[in-house]
Regions:
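Residue-level recognition of the GNAT/N-acetyltransferase active site
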Residues: 6, 76, 168-169
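Paired acidic/hydrophobic, glycine-rich loop segments that form the ligand-binding mouth/hinge
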Residues: 49-53, 134-139
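Central regulatory/effector-binding core of bacterial HTH transcription factors
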Residues: 1-58, 119
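Short amphipathic alpha-helical coupling segments at ligand-binding clamshell hinges
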Residues: 13, 17, 84-87, 172-186
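A short, acidic, flexible beta-alpha connecting loop/helix-capping segment that sits on the rim
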Residues: 159, 169-171
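C-terminal regulatory
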Residues: 24, 41-45, 58-133, 142-162, ...
């Protein structure tokens, strides 16, 4: 079974998911492709059979919602803000780091000053935030491994990203993909964490 996912999902959840799945189904061999915005094209072309993505990138595919993960403000450790929550408008007064087609883009005014980072990897953005180059809004999944390097603030108006599994067609999916989808359905039904 060839699956694709974002680097943040690969860091935050995939090891645990694959370990649990392999314990139940050692006969199914897994191949993981870690990519960014290219995942829908990889799914459409058949390069992968299943993609763990956000709902927006699953457009045109059958999508099994699994969990919602909050979007959070990520700022340098010395960012001059006292509270634990921050209005998006205040955050946008700073140089804003984002990648093209990032999930926060639809919520931003078109004239938002930002430094475009041509990277599909949230890790690059987090490193730049840690280096004091600006601020960002990312999925809470993205923060795994960066704790202590950046400061995390809740957004005053909460936003969440719906994550799930996308396949070309539930009916046309192979046995391995259907088995993995059933596993995900059961796993996320028992576990409250995204």
């Amino acid at each position: 079974l060839r699956i694709g996912c974002f680097a943040s999902i690969a860091r935050a959840r995939l090891p645990e998911l694959l370990r649990a799945f392999r314990a139940l189904h050692p006969e199914i061999k897994m191949d993981v492709l870690v990519r960014g915005d290219e995942l829908p094209a990889a799914l459409a072309s058949g390069e992968i059979q299943l993609a763990l993505v956000d709902e927006a990138r699953a457009k045109g595919f059958d999508f099994l919602p699994l969990a919602d993960t909050p979007l959070v403000a990520v700022v340098p450790p010395d960012f001059p803000w006292e509270g634990e929550t921050i209005p998006l408008e205040r955050l946008l007064r700073e140089p804003f780091l984002s990648s093209p087609d990032q999930y926060i883009e639809p919520f931003l005014p078109p004239d938002t000053p930002r430094l475009e980072v041509t990277a599909s990897d949230d890790g690059s953005i987090l490193s730049m935030v840690a280096g004091g180059l600006g601020v960002s809004v990312l999925s809470a999944f993205s923060l795994v491994g960066y704790e202590g390097h950046v400061r995390v603030l809740q957004l005053e108006e909460p936003f969440a990203l719906r994550l799930g599994a996308a396949v070309k067609s539930l009916n046309a999916s192979g046995t391995s993909a259907r088995t993995f989808l059933s596993f995900l359905r059961e796993y996320y039904g028992k576990n409250d964490t995204p």
